């Protein structure tokens, strides 16, 4: 049986072949140029919607990173101040030991009092110190900040947690730590009067200094624990971020090797179709169309 094709059918077939090859070549060229596998959600609804979810996850990851950096900086500032305050508390405790020497006279006690007062003034300044942005290092209140999924930590060190109750950032002289040190200063002043009378016994003064020292060091340790949590969260979120980026790339980004091969194939077909159509145009078969 002989199959016959009309001239119009041959012409339309040639035109359609060129259009198909051109469309495919342009599509692959767009993917190579943009680096994106899909231009519209309709190209692959699942992949694009999954990509949107990945974008959301990456945005959350960026939020976690910002929170981690903020918390790490806040606690680093607090720890620097508390390290110094702990050293000053140790100096006060050494002064207390010196004050128990039986060889001291009233002038010696007055000299120790001056040293203790100077330390207290320096500590008060550190209690109310501000960071580089002008915010108090030890705030009257702190927030809970999420550093990774389902993990919340204190944004910083609370003023009363470090220095005891009774005072605020505006009234540091009312905190337990300040009052305990002030009692030591008063004790030294009274010893310098050589009356034999003191408002507080040495045991009471020592107990107050030790209580404030213990509270400060415990707060410093807790802050260090938060810093370790942040470090662990950074490590975990960094690995998760790499996984998200890889997944998104595999899902949405153009596979350049495959796309280049497909583009080359489509371009070859287009060139062949154009050449064939050119020969058909020159043929007598279409001279009367």
Where on the chain are the PLM-derived regions?
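Amphipathic alpha-helical polymerization modules
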Residues: 1-139, 186-289
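Cysteine-poor, low-complexity segments in flexible/peripheral regions
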Residues: 141-197
């Amino acid at each position: 049986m002989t199959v016959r094709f009309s001239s119009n059918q041959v012409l339309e077939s040639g035109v359609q072949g060129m259009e198909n090859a051109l469309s495919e070549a342009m599509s692959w060229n767009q993917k190579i140029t943009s680096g994106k596998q899909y231009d519209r959600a309709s190209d692959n609804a699942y992949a694009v919607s999954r990509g949107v979810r990945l974008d959301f996850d990456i945005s959350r990851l960026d939020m976690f990173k910002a929170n981690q950096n903020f918390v790490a900086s806040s606690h680093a500032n607090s720890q620097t101040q508390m390290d110094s305050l702990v050293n000053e508390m140790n100096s006060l405790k050494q002064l207390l030991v010196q004050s128990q020497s039986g060889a001291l006279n009233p002038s010696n006690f007055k000299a120790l009092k001056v040293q203790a007062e100077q330390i207290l003034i320096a500590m008060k300044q550190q209690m109310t110190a501000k960071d580089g942005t002008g915010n108090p290092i030890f705030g009257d209140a702190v927030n809970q900040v999420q550093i990774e999924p389902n993990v919340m930590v204190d944004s910083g060190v609370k003023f009363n947690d470090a220095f005891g109750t009774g005072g605020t950032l505006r009234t540091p002289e009312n905190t337990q730590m300040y009052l305990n040190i002030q009692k030591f200063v008063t004790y030294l002043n009274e010893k310098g009067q050589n009356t034999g009378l003191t408002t507080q016994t040495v045991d009471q003064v020592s107990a107050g200094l030790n209580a404030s020292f213990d509270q400060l060091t415990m707060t410093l340790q807790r802050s260090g624990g938060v810093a370790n949590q942040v470090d662990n969260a950074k490590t975990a979120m960094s690995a998760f971020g790499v996984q998200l980026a890889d997944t998104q790339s595999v899902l949405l980004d153009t596979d350049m090797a495959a796309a280049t091969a497909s583009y080359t194939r489509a371009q070859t077909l287009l060139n062949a179709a154009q050449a064939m159509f050119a020969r058909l145009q020159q043929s007598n078969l279409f001279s009367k169309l």
